[in-house]
């Protein structure tokens, strides 16, 4: 029987999920996105050729894989078409490989306008959203006024629903935010123009996945962003608008949670965060600059500079707990090469001197703490491109072993470079 594997980020995103998903899809029949939207950026490097995907699952480059966008994903038709056209120019037969849930909420131009207007109005209290309409689209879903992909297939009813929701949002844009209204006729025309094309790729995702499971076909679920950005369990309100944790698989795809076999947590050997929000181990010094430069820490979606810091075990333990992590994939180990010492956060100290080994439940709590750091010897030798544990310096092996001890969870995969070949699979999640 095939296994059903979840791959998700355990930090604030940008952990290197795209490469690992691409590597593991060699063994999968289906790759499923279950949350987020085109705010995610997954970078794949294959034989030196870089491809950045935002919406379509990372398995799209493999001819043995069907890629699925589940109902938990908010879908921007224009962004989807841009990505499809980019892939088709590279010779990828997207229509043969991509399937979409009719229940995906649509991101339309007024969602993006609202997103940008709100961020501007927040001033120095801005959350740091990508401005791509993700949050407003999820809001419409929860308030039950949102339009879904399936609504496009009845033009008359879609036009009626669109008029109603745009009247509501344009009122907010013009009267509250003092911005221009979004044009209804243009929005309607653009949306309906690709209705038939989208319909050709739509399917009942829950039924398809259940039939695949019963047939013993391996399924890989691809998470976007990271655990600490989860709407419920992250550093609220500096979070995304979806459930980035393993629980989101069931709600975002219609796949039964009892049928998940393995949860692979992707963990960078240090930590980064992009945008605003608390970050206890942030390094605003020359070491932070070193990690940011060597790690090429710029967002794949926005191009924004990421904020680097030491690995935070307190936050990682919460990720293990929430996601039932079976094993970790450690990425960007090579970025630590050349440091005389490396540090790990093992506790949070509060102003009254108490030390906690569990995370707070909101941003305000994180802002009170200072990290309790454990120092380990660094290594001068390179780990870049290593393909076996025996090739690693002893100090790097000691670092990995210490992480496993602290997290009480094995590191089953080690990544030592951006290419899919620069990876050590110690335990195969699909085996």
UniProtKB/Swiss-Prot annotation:
Note on cofactor: Binds 1 Mg(2+) ion per subunit.
Which positions in this protein are listed as binding substrate? 300-306
The positions annotated for binding Mg(2+) are 14, 41
Biological process (GO), any one: IMP metabolic process
UniProt keywords (A-Z) are: Cytoplasm, GTP-binding, Ligase, Magnesium, Metal-binding, Nucleotide-binding, Purine biosynthesis
Q: What enzyme category does the UniProt record give? A: ligase
Q: Which reaction does it catalyse?
A: IMP + L-aspartate + GTP = N(6)-(1,2-dicarboxyethyl)-AMP + GDP + phosphate + 2 H(+)
Q: Which GO terms describe its molecular function?
A: adenylosuccinate synthase activity; GTP binding; magnesium ion binding
The answer to whether UniProt assigns keyword Magnesium to this entry is yes
Cited function: Plays an important role in the de novo pathway of purine nucleotide biosynthesis. Catalyzes the first committed step in the biosynthesis of AMP from IMP.
Oligomeric state and interaction partners are given as: Homodimer.
Protein's name in the database: Adenylosuccinate synthetase
The organism is: Shewanella piezotolerans (strain WP3 / JCM 13877)
């Amino acid at each position: 029987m095939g296994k059903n594997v979840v791959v998700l980020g355990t930090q604030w995103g940008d952990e290197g999920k795209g490469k690992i998903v691409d590597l593991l899809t060699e063994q999968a029949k289906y790759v499923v996105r279950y949350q987020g939207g085109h705010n995610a950026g997954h970078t794949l490097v294959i034989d030196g050729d870089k491809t950045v995907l935002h919406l379509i699952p990372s398995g799209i480059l493999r001819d043995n894989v069907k890629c699925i966008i589940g109902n938990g994903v908010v879908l921007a038709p224009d962004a989807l078409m841009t990505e499809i056209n980019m892939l088709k120019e590279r010779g990828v037969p997207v229509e043969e490989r991509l399937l979409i849930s009719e229940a995906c909420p649509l991101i339309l131009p007024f969602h993006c306008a609202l997103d940008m207007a709100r961020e501007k109005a927040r001033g120095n209290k801005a959350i740091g959203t990508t401005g791509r309409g993700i949050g407003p689209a999820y809001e419409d879903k929860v308030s039950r006024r949102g339009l879904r992909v399936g609504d496009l297939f009845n033009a008359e009813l879609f036009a009626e629903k669109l008029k109603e929701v745009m009247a509501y949002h344009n009122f907010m844009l013009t009267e509250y935010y003092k911005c221009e209204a979004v044009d209804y006729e243009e929005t309607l025309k653009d949306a309906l123009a690709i209705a038939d094309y989208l319909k050709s790729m739509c399917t009942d995702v829950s039924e398809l996945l259940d039939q695949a499971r019963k047939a013993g076909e391996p399924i890989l679920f691809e998470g976007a962003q990271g655990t600490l950005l989860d709407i419920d369990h992250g550093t609220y309100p500096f979070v995304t608008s979806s459930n980035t944790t393993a629980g989101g698989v069931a709600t975002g795809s219609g796949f039964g949670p009892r049928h998940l076999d393995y949860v692979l947590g992707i963990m960078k050997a240090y930590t980064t965060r992009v945008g605003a929000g608390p970050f206890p181990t942030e390094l605003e010094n020359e070491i932070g600059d070193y990690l940011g430069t060597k790690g090429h820490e710029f967002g794949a979606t926005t191009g924004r500079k990421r904020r680097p810091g030491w690995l935070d075990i307190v936050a990682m333990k919460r990720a293990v707990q929430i996601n039932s992590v079976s094993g970790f994939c450690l990425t960007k180990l090579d970025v630590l090469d050349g440091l005389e010492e490396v540090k790990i956060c093992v506790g949070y100290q509060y102003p009254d001197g108490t030390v906690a080994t569990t995370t707070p439940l909101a941003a305000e709590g994180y802002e009170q703490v200072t990290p309790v750091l454990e120092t380990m010897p660094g290594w001068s030798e390179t780990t870049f491109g290593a393909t076996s544990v025996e090739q690693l310096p002893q100090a790097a092996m000691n670092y990995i072993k210490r992480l496993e001890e602290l997290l009480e969870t094995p590191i089953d995969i080690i990544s030592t470079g951006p290419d899919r070949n620069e990876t050590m699979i110690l335990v195969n999640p699909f085996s």
